[in-house]
Design a protein with these regions (language model features):
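N-terminal secretory signal peptides that target proteins for export/translocation
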Residues: 1-18
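Bacterial N-terminal signal peptides
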Residues: 22-34
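Extracellular/periplasmic carbohydrate-active domains that bind, remodel
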Residues: 36-435
Length: 435
């Protein structure tokens, strides 16, 4: 994913320097030729025994195709038309997984196919697709990757709250563990048992021109969760899920540390339908910095911009620029809270710790929302008020107004129309400075 720049030669250089330049060009040519060779190598999974009939498990055949391509330096593992039933698969460096239009990679519903592993510092089941310490991975093709997660969702609803509930362990659909240079494009990812796409401690991840889907009531089916990752670019995605459409994370509740931040993330030209919105948190002990979002349309999401944490999982959160957002029938267009998941009616300041959230420098420009239930919530902790929130050209029509507590907001051309009650409710240590 580099940019080739023209090489300017100084013909007055010494012969030795010229030889070094020519040598570099020769090596670059070898690298380019090797890359083209990798791209040209195709391992069709049917040649390794895959049936694609939706009944026989094709796990071994598909993994054999991945391993064979990787052993030769990389290539394309191709799934043509058909339904390829599989357990967990492990991707390798320099592999393109191409799921053609008309093909579905379908996750097995057999719990025994998913070994228990340590993942994100906790117990989990092996993801349907994963890669560890890998680079230059591509997933594309116009087809679908389906986690087939309904049995896990049903188990969660049947046993939620029960002690020692082992069915709470569910496989994620795609985990990129300490990977770099990843491209996911033109593919539908759907119906994961749990979080769908998780870049974990990864760098340079591009996700574009696709769909991520799950039923509105499917539990914890987050669309994309960058976790302690950097340089993640998400664009032209339709995300319709049962939980956060996107949730940027870093760290775990009560994390002992150390934790790394998520940084330099851009989200552009996307549509978010059912789900909990464009979220930061709640697990952000490592912090989240430099997030940019533009030209996002929200329809029927529970929240729009959602920044959430609490005293047992917070960190330094800020330098966000969100602009050109449109929202229809969104529950709460702006939800910024250091009291996730519930805001108490009364509270007093607590000692500041390593996990106390600190929200700052959150800038929202050109937002228009209609049909909202509650215009907004901006509520900080008394020991860590939210600072430097700017609302510029923001217009919200809602049933209820906006509530601000332990937060300082600067507003320019900010309008809230509430069908009932006061459009602005200012509680303890709250300030809206209108410019």
């Amino acid at each position: 994913m580099g940019i080739f720049m023209p090489l300017q030669l100084n013909f007055a250089t010494s012969r030795a320097a010229s030889h070094r330049v020519l040598g570099a060009l020769f090596l670059s040519g070898l690298v380019l030729c090797g890359t083209l060779a990798h791209a040209a190598r195709v391992c069709d999974v049917t040649a390794y025994g895959a049936k694609g009939d939706g009944a026989a498990k094709d796990t071994r055949a598909i993994q054999d195709a991945i391993d064979a391509c990787a052993a030769k330096g990389g290539g394309t593992v191709r799934l043509a038309a058909g339904t390829f039933l599989t357990g967990p698969l492990v991707l390798k460096s320099h592999i393109t997984l191409e799921v053609d239009a008309g093909a579905t990679l379908l996750g097995s519903q057999d719990r025994a196919d998913y070994p228990e592993v340590q993942e994100l510092r906790e117990r989990a089941l092996q993801p349907l697709l994963s890669a560890t310490h890998a680079e230059h991975i591509v997933i594309r093709g116009g087809g679908a990757i389906d986690g087939n997660g309904k049995p896990w969702w049903d188990a969660v609803y049947a046993h939620r709250g029960a002690p020692n509930f082992t069915a709470a362990l569910r496989p994620r659909l795609l985990l990129l563990d300490r990977c770099k240079h990843v491209l996911i494009e033109n593919v539908t990812i759907q119906n994961s048992a749990s979080w769908q796409v998780v870049p974990y401690y990864s760098d340079d991840v591009v996700i574009r021109n696709g769909k991520i889907l799950a039923p509105a009531r499917s539990p914890n089916t987050d669309g994309i969760d960058p976790f302690s990752s950097s340089h993640v670019r998400i664009s032209h995605m339709l995300i319709d899920t049962g939980d956060d459409n996107i949730a940027i994370k870093s760290g775990q509740p009560n994390s002992p540390g150390p934790d790394s931040p998520s940084t330099d993330i851009t989200i552009t030209d996307c549509t978010f339908l059912h789900g909990h919105g464009m979220s930061m948190g709640s697990e952000i002990a490592g912090g989240v910095q430099r997030v940019r979002a533009a030209r996002i349309h929200f329809k029927d999401t529970a929240s729009g911009v959602r920044i959430k944490s609490n005293r047992d999982r917070g960190g330094d959160i800020g330098n966000f620029d969100f602009r050109d957002l449109t929202m229809e029938d969104v529950g709460t267009p702006i939800l910024i809270t250091e009291y996730y998941p519930r805001i108490p009616p009364h509270d007093t300041a607590q000692p500041v710790t390593r996990l106390t959230p600190h929200f700052h420098d959150i800038h929202i420009r050109n937002l228009k929302a209609t049909g909202a239930k509650e215009a907004g919530i901006i509520v900080g902790l008394p020991e860590s008020p939210i600072t430097t929130v700017t609302l510029d050209h923001v217009e919200i029509a809602a049933q209820k107004g906006i509530t601000v507590s332990d937060a300082t907001v600067t507003a320019h051309d900010f309008s809230v129309t509430a069908a009932a009650g006061d459009p602005y409710t200012m509680l303890e240590n709250a300030k809206i400075d209108r410019k």
